[in-house]
């Protein structure tokens, strides 16, 4: 649910910026473009940390699965295998969520870059269209 609220707010922010760029509204456009570099850097750092955590979870998972395969009795293995299946699904869900966030970030970057180029090409005089 939180992701949907975040996506809706991000979409609304891009729509508002697009309208400001169309009006050559420097007061609204410039702060958004100026903050973009920091926002992108933070996204990259957060994505790296999440991917690092996913990789660590996968390595731990693989080690435990290997140990179970090598040492488990048939009855115990069944219960432990079920836990591993659920944990594997959780890790894959995290990876899919991160991949979706990266995809959306790429689309957002493309939109921001296109709006910035439009603004620079059409609003270079320093006068706002009102």
Model-derived regions: residue spans:
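C-terminal amphipathic alpha-helix
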Residues: 28, 32, 89-130
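Immediate post-signal-peptide N-terminus of mature secreted/exported proteins
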Residues: 10-59
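Short, flexible helical or helix-coil boundary motifs
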Residues: 24, 28, 52, 62, ...
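Intrinsic disorder/low-complexity segments enriched in polar/small residues
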Residues: 45, 52-53, 71, 82, ...
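Extended alpha-helical coiled-coil "stalk/arm" regions
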Residues: 47-83
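Classic N-terminal secretory signal peptides
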Residues: 1-12
């Amino acid at each position: 649910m939180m992701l949907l609220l975040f996506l809706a707010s991000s979409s609304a922010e891009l729509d508002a910026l697009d309208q400001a760029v169309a009006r050559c509204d420097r007061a609204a456009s410039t702060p958004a473009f100026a903050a973009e570099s920091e926002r992108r850097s933070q996204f990259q750092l957060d994505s790296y940390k999440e991917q690092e955590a996913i990789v660590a979870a996968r390595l731990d998972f693989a080690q435990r699965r290997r140990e179970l395969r090598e040492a488990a009795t048939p009855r115990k293995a069944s219960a432990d295998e079920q836990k591993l299946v659920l944990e594997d699904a959780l890790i894959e869900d995290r990876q899919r969520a991160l991949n979706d966030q990266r995809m959306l970030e790429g689309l957002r970057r493309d939109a921001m870059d296109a709006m910035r180029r439009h603004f620079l090409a059409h609003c270079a005089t320093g006068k706002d269209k009102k």
